From Swiss-Prot:
It catalyses: L-glutamate = D-glutamate. Provides the (R)-glutamate required for cell wall biosynthesis. The active site is at residues 75, 186. PANTHER family: GLUTAMATE RACEMASE. Its EC number is 5.1.1.3. This is Glutamate racemase. Keywords: Cell shape, Cell wall biogenesis/degradation, Isomerase, Peptidoglycan synthesis. Pfam families: Asp_Glu_race. GO terms for biological process: cell wall organization; peptidoglycan biosynthetic process; regulation of cell shape. Belongs to the aspartate/glutamate racemases family. InterPro entries: Asp/Glu/hydantoin_racemase, Asp/Glu_race, Asp/Glu_racemase_AS_1, Asp/Glu_racemase_AS_2, Glu_race. It is an enzyme of class 5 (isomerase). It comes from the Bacteria.
Length: 265
């Protein structure tokens, strides 16, 4: 039985999961968080499911060695490829994954047209198709794969003209099709909200699932009597790329500095 004071492992293909990490820390400030950014293998969205499962198994094993009491797959593509596999490997481990916010978007739309920005891997998955079948029968869903977007966000420069131009190229067709609700189907994309605010009308809802994932983690930890009790927890970081790169990006995306260690390939 894990201790309440044990850490929670959070992983992503890169820095996108920091958007989820922030929501977890906001809701559960007493938790100690371990974050692995698999930047040496980013992006996951264009890689095979088998490759992604291998990476997720490797990282889950690391969290297990660190004594983590729960794990969050803060990556839509990793969830699609690996969550079932990891639940089979670790059946007693509280495990939270991501999925595009199809249900709340379908409820929120007024025009009946919902746009989805996501990676190719997420959009082509059976899990995403099942979400549409379950929650989006009464709305039109227009999907937009966004190759290249994750790589630009990984640089930490969220105001570059190249990023702005690429994002507009993906968003403009959705707006032209009448979308009044946009789903951010990748954990990297919430960092683009300031850019999106200048591109989409004020009455277009932009939805992601970071806060919902934090609430689900809270429910699972509570159900297993694993919620940490003061003092405030901290966050520690690992990366499969150059640690110095993540150290420079953390103040931009995490709004704090952090200790970053190398994660063995």
């Amino acid at each position: 039985m894990a201790e309440r004071s044990a850490p929670v492992g959070v992983m992503d293909s890169g820095v996108g999961g920091l958007s989820v990490l922030a929501e977890i820390q906001r809701l559960l400030p007493n938790e100690t968080l371990l974050y692995v950014a698999d930047c040496g293998h980013v992006p996951y969205g264009e890689k095979s499911p088998d490759y992604i499962r291998q990476r997720c198994r490797h990282i889950a094993g690391f969290f297990h060695e660190q004594g983590a009491k729960a794990m969050v797959l803060a990556c839509n593509t990793a969830t699609v490829a690996a969550v079932a596999d990891l639940r089979e490997l670790y059946p007693t481990w509280p495990l939270v994954g991501m999925e595009p916010a199809v249900k709340p978007a379908a409820a929120a739309t007024r025009s009946g047209v919902v746009g989805v920005l996501a990676t190719t891997g997420t959009l082509q998955s059976a899990k995403f198709a099942a979400l549409l079948d379950r929650f989006a029968n009464d709305v039109q869903v227009i999907t937009q794969p966004c190759p290249g977007l994750v790589e630009l966000i990984e640089t930490g420069d969220l105001t570059s003209p190249v990023l702005r131009q690429m994002l507009w190229g993906y968003v403009q067709p959705l707006l032209a099709a009448g979308c009044d609700t946009l789903i951010l189907g990748c954990t990297h994309y919430p960092f683009l909200r300031p850019l999106l605010a200048g591109m989409v009308p004020a009455d277009v809802a932009v939805i992601d699932t970071g806060a919902a994932v934090a609430r689900q983690l809270q429910r699972l930890l509570g159900a297993n009597d694993l919620l940490a009790e003061g003092p405030a927890g901290d966050a520690r970081f690992w990366t499969s790329a150059d640690p110095e790169i993540l150290r420079k990006i953390l103040p931009v995306l995490w709004h704090k500095c952090g200790d970053v260690q190398s994660f063995a390939l």
